[in-house]
Structures are given as structure tokens and as C-alpha cells.
Amino acid sequence: MERKSAAGSIRNKERSKKKNFLDAVGEILKTKGYAALKINDIAATAGVDKKMIYTYFGGMDGLMDEYIRSQDYWSKMTPGDTAPNFDDHGRAFAKELLLAQYDYVHKNKEAQKLLLWRLSEPRKSLKKMTDTQEENGEALFKFVADPFFGERAKEYRAIMSILVSGLYYLNMYASLNGSIFCGIDLNTPEGRDTVKKAISFLVDQTYDNLNTKQE
């Protein structure tokens, strides 16, 4: 029994150290930006020997990969998440995903910094994040939207690309250099609710007017 307890304690300590490294990456990213993500600074912030980065993650790239996976909203979405009832051909689910993304990025400063990093520097782990997003998105499109929109499925995908990127931009804009966009204060509950209503309206209009089949 004591041996099992000791083994469990060791595993907990290992998990705690790994989490310290991931938290350190997030803290540095939030406060200093991606350019400050150096192995010595990460180890110092985590309070763990830098050699353990190689033990737990195989090196800096492995650490960055795991951190990015933990923060990116769309990389977490997989075909297994498409469990809801799709009698409406994904209309409600599309709204749910977009609104959840809007709130997630708004509340998560690390995700905001990750977006800036992604636009500022070529990096294998960031490219991998993009590839994972596309793979997950492709599965969702094929499983839910393409059968309903038929020959106009590409137009639906284009509309979704505009909505996803637009919501990213509105959050970044409100967080960095201003809050008023097209006369809407994006940092107030009222302003954000207005954007959310617009998203629901646009999804409804897409489903009502773009489909080649009757719901």
C-alpha cells in the first residue's frame, strides 16, 4: 500500500511540474510576448530545472506543441464532439461553435497572444495548429454541412471562414487598441450581445437562403 501511495505521489509531482511549465509559457506570452519565450526564462518562471523540459516534452518544440494544443479553441474540436442532434443540419451547432469561440478568445488572453504569434512568425508548432484546425473543420463540414448545402457547400464554407476570422479580429481589436468598432462598444456586455445576435442572424440567413434542399 505504501509503495502504491509513493508511486501516486511521484506521478502527481510529475504532472504538477509539467503544468508549471505550461503555465509559465502562458504567463510569459501574456506579459512579455512570444519573443520572450526562451528556455531559461520558462524554467525560471516555472521554478523547475530546464532539463525537465526535455524529459517531459522532448524539448522546446514539444513544450510549445502541447501548450498550443491546450489553448487553441478550434484545435480542440474533433468529429467526436459532433454528438448533438443534427436534425437542423447543423444550424444550432454552427451558432454554438461560433458564439463559444467568441467568448473563449475574449476571456483568454493567452489565446489572444497566440493568435498574434501565429500571424507574426513561421513556426512548425503553429503550422501544426493550423493543420489540426483544418483537419477538424474538414470533418465537421463533411459530416454536417456538405450534405445539406450540396453544390453550394463551398459558399457555406466561405461564409464560415468570414465569420470565424471576423470574430477573431473583433476580439483582438477590442483587447489591444480600441473598443469601438462600427459604433459598437465591444468591451461592454451590450456590445458583445449585439455581435452575438448578428452571428445568429447571419447563420439563420445562410441556412434559409443558401441551401439547395428544404429543411
Label each PLM-derived region with a short phrase.
Residues 64-71, 129:
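Alpha-helical DNA-contacting segments of helix-turn-helix folds
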Residues 66, 79-107, 111, 159-160:
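Hydrophobic alpha-helical connector segments
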Residues 39, 68-75:
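Short, basic, alpha-helical segments at the C-terminal edge of helix-turn-helix-like DNA-binding modules
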Residues 20, 24, 28-62, 66:
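Helix-turn-helix
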Residues 75-77, 83, 114, 122-149, ...:
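Amphipathic alpha-helical packing segments from all-alpha helical-bundle domains
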Residues 105-127, 174-181:
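Amphipathic alpha-helical segments used for helix-helix packing
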